[in-house]
Curated annotation (Swiss-Prot):
Listed PROSITE patterns: USP_1, USP_2, USP_3
Gene: Usp36
Physiological role: Required for maintaining multiple types of adult stem cells, including male and female germline, epithelial follicle cell and intestinal stem cells. May function as a transcriptional repressor by continually deubiquiting histone H2B at the promoters of genes critical for cellular differentiation, thereby preventing histone H3 'Lys-4' trimethylation (H3K4). Controls selective autophagy activation by ubiquitinated proteins.
Protein name (database record): Ubiquitin carboxyl-terminal hydrolase 36
One GO term describing the cellular component: nucleolus
Species whose genome carries this gene: Drosophila simulans
Top-level division of the source organism's lineage: Eukaryota
Amino acid sequence: MLHSLVPRYNKCVPFPTLRTDNNGARKQAEHPNNQSHHNHPHPTSNPNELPKPKRVLYPRENIRIGWKQSERKWQVGTGMINVGNTCYLNSTLQALLHIPALANWLVSEQAHLADCNVAEPGSGCIICAMAKTLLATQSNQSAVRPFLIYSKLKQICKHMVVGRQEDAHEFLRFLVEAMERAYLMRFRNYKELDQLVKETTPLGQIFGGYLRSEVRCLSCNHVSITFQHFQDLLLDIRKADSLEDAFEGHFSRERLEDMGYKCEGCKKKVSATKQFSLERAPITLCIQLKRFSMIGNKLTKQISFKPRIDLSKYAARSPAAQAQPLTYRLVSMVTHLGASQHCGHYTAIGSTDTGSFYNFDDSYVRPITMQNVCNTNAYIMFFELDLSQAASPPANRPNGVRLTNGHSTTPVPAATVSSPSPTRFIGPQLPPVGANGYTNGNAQKTAIQFKQQNQQNGLQLGTGKFQDTAKPPLVGAYAKGEATSAPTANGNKSSSPSSNSSSNHKSINQQQYLPISSDDEDIDDEMKPGPTTAQLPSMPNMTEDSTEPKAKSPVKIHLKTPVKTPLKSLVPYESASEEEEAPLPNPRQSTEGEDFSESDQESGQTNGHSKTNGSLTNGSASSSVHVNNSKQKTDAIDEIFKSLKKSADSEEDDDEEEPSIQLTNGWHPQKQSQSQSKAPPSPKTPPSPAVIKSKTGIWKVTRNDEVDAIDDDDDAVVVEGAPVKIPTPNKTHRNPFSSSKPSTDSPATPGAKRQKLLNGSALKSHQQPRVGNGYQSNVTSNGSTVNELLKQSYRGYGASVLSWNGKPAELEKEPFELVCAKRIAGHGSVEGSDIVEGSVAVDAAVTSSSDSNDVVVIAVALLVDAREQRQRDLDDDEENEMDRGRQRKVKSGSAKGNNASNSTPGYNPFQEYEGQKRWNKNGGGGGFSRFHNQNYRQNFQQRNKFKFNRFGGQGSAKFQQQRALQRHLSAGGGFSRRQPSAQQQQQT
């Protein structure tokens, strides 16, 4: 008989093992009776329908759903005292006792409660203990101690201990199972009842339901149907963000293991798919979200859910399943606070007969809004059937919370949410209670007003406290702010006065560094609707020639974003020339060679701005005062740039002078008062660079390349041995305003001296020529680094390419072996003298031989000589190397004396002697310990030589040998491992 049942049971793997994963697999394995399989249909029933039990222990119709079905007036309930890590117990009890169906059944057990005795510890009925605990929470005004439950913890679960942290879902399953056993013990032959009958207990009728499992063969499309009893649904939330997504994943069709299902039609193992559906929904649906894994980790993601759920789309296609109500409402839940299942805290949330929710945190009870309930990271949720929604069609079932509880027979007004009118509001609303859960006479009216406000504003909020009746004035104020907003300095609109003040503050801090446009252009910018998109200001062009004339095309850019990183002064300026007063390139100018009169007119307005109470005012009077000053500066600068155009004779000088002019003219901040007090120079006489008097000395503002020239001049002074005066600004060949050319300097000038120095005329008689390795900072007469780059090579960077000037580099012209010979020949010297001598020797050898083959032979010979010299140097270093503790030095007596032939390589007599003392510590026949102090040991032998002859007498060979060894070691000598017998005889 068992053999005939194997194919049928192979069709469906047990539910906990088939849909298990890392989350919650342990709890499913611990409760094998949680879900049972029914593969034996009644002989007279359809095999595709749920079988009917032979006996019903408690009818399903006797379960009273909802708080209104009981004659008792239900209270909120008190908290429960935590007696030591019992938060899991308190939270589970609070969640169970706030389920209306379970609470109504416990209260109805008055007859059994009178006959059952629960006073004895470790015995009694757990159902009566639950009923008394429920009555205690309803009657007391303070927190109760659930001692009737935790005193029977061993009866509920054997491995649970009071005071230890446990899992709330595990305790829930064992508690419900214990209550079922207690109910079955009322019947005499309960052990003989089949599984279908045992599932008809009150606990089975409240929490129990049936799932239809359909396994479809992919080869012959044969469908095998089985039914499974369940009391909770374990939903995987790893790939779900809401409760509906978790339901979709649980009831979706999944593929079984390939070739792992034995089909009844094919009679072989094939691939198949499996899908669950609701055959009979439970009255109270218990949902556990798989937040814990096997190793104790917790998945703390937020799972959104609604207070009402509809499971109609997951119902089976059978007529009985389609006719049942599948709309549920939230009644209670258990939450877990913590990072893992081994630590944390459990709390509970329960509903009352008024429809409000309360949070139960051990002994603390406080009301909680529906919005906070839905935002809670739930662990266990209890939903109960909503029979009030079962009468209406599924399409007309609203998802929001009703204003009434829905279980009374009183008619609902048409203005409430349950009305099927077109203006019906769908969504969560407040129940007809106040903030603390107490009803008032205006609750229903207030809810209707909230609904109208929601329809006007287009918002749907869950609670009335979030509704705002003053939104039209706020909207009007916001529109007014938008209308009156003006463009700020960055081109964006802002209605906040703080942003305007902050932008003005930034402009005040930067007014002495940055050019500011004129008032007329500011007015034009405000009148014209410029673009509001952010644009970067034009930066100074450091690569183009500033002396080339370009087309005058003034471009006005509406963006007025100041540069936020101005260059600060590195020198304490106390006076400045007019040529350094030119500001930074204006963002309104797109090129360097635009109309300079416009640029200077804008820069002249920089001094026209004044600070008034921390704000920048562009006064017309202050701007008109400096009009003549701006015109004079314009004429002077025009003459300056005309002279610069005439003095530009080469491309290298132009490229070098252009960035320095910009640095001198644009990037040095100047004080406004000093620049205003200085009179403009004559247009015919170009101004010279400024000489500044400060506390540290006299400073001269020049360009960076002039500093390099002065450094080179210092070198020239050392070579020539004659003092050189510092050139005055009028005679400096680097002066950008000088009309003379740099090539017309007299030989006495530092530039001529440096030219002679680099050409080699003055260098031949004083010092050795410099070796140009491409990394020295010496520059040529034109002050450019391009000539140094021309001498460098691209060797080692891939294919051979030309140098900077398009010709092969100087290093590439020489053979590679010769270059290596030059480098190796000068390897051994630290001071560098050998390098020069080796290079000179190689050059002399190369110049003496004109043939290329001779050059290669010479190079090879030099390589061999250099290698031999390096080997000789290395040998000398090894001989002269001092001992730094890296090599162990061992003294040995084998190298001298008559025992040289008996020495062993690597033998260390000191190590053997020290080790022998430790090895023979307790040896020697007499049992006396050998002391490490040899002097003490010697005295010991002298004092005890007459008591017993331990060493065979004073004249024995062993005693004499040890004494000789001590004298030999004290003298600093060594010894071999074994002494010859002839020497021992001589000692004796």
